[in-house]
UniProtKB/Swiss-Prot annotation:
UniProt KW keywords: Disulfide bond, Glycoprotein, Hormone, Secreted, Signal
Protein name, per record: Thyrotropin subunit beta
Principal subcellular localization: secreted
Taxon lineage: Eukaryota, Metazoa, Chordata, Craniata, Vertebrata
Quaternary organization: Heterodimer of a common alpha chain and a unique beta chain which confers biological specificity to thyrotropin, lutropin, follitropin and gonadotropin.
Record-stated family: Belongs to the glycoprotein hormones subunit beta family.
InterPro entries in UniProt: Cystine-knot_cytokine, Glyco_hormone_CN, Gonadotropin_bsu, Gonadotropin_bsu_CS
Annotated source species: Anguilla japonica (Japanese eel)
Cell compartments where the protein resides: Secreted
UniProt keyword annotation of Glycoprotein present: yes
Length: 147
């Protein structure tokens, strides 16, 4: 009997992982500053994927407790800094960006997460000449573990 319960528990844990496919994926940011001469493409990772959600069609206070609204968000993130080329001396050429290390499914907390994002219809575009190779400062690590 204990073996059956243990096997059932393990299967439930595995099913939860299968139903929630949320992981870091490659993403390219296009960054430019008005004062600088170039736009740069920065390769990073973001959290993306499917998280199990449940939104009942019935209205009422008791039903609200049944709703499960979770999104794919950062569990561990590291911030890196790139230096934008072609900036005049009075302009700070540094740009910091997040790199997703681990992702998780959880309810959005507006105090710590960006809960909504409206992408432009055109996608990312540069208004200046594009430089394709950007590297973070060597040896930099600003690892932040969140729970």
């Amino acid at each position: 009997m204990r073996v059956v319960l243990l096997a059932s528990g393990v299967l439930c844990l595995l099913a939860g992982q299968v139903l929630s496919i949320c992981s870091p994926v490659d993403y390219t940011l296009y960054v430019e500053k008005p004062e600088c001469d170039f736009c740069v493409a920065i390769n990073t990772t973001i959290c993306m994927g499917f998280c199990y959600s449940l939104d009942p069609n019935v209205v009422g206070p008791a039903v609200k407790r049944l709703a499960v609204q979770r999104g794919c968000t950062y569990q561990a993130v590291e911030y890196r800094t790139a230096e934008l080329p072609g900036c005049p001396p009075h302009v700070d050429p540094r740009f910091s960006y997040p790199v997703a290390l681990h992702c998780t499914c959880r309810a959005c907390d507006p105090a710590r997460d960006e809960c909504t994002h409206r992408a432009s219809a055109d996608g990312d575009r540069c208004s200046k000449p594009l430089l394709l190779h950007m590297h973070a400062y060597p040896g930099q690590s600003n690892h932040i573990q969140t729970l």
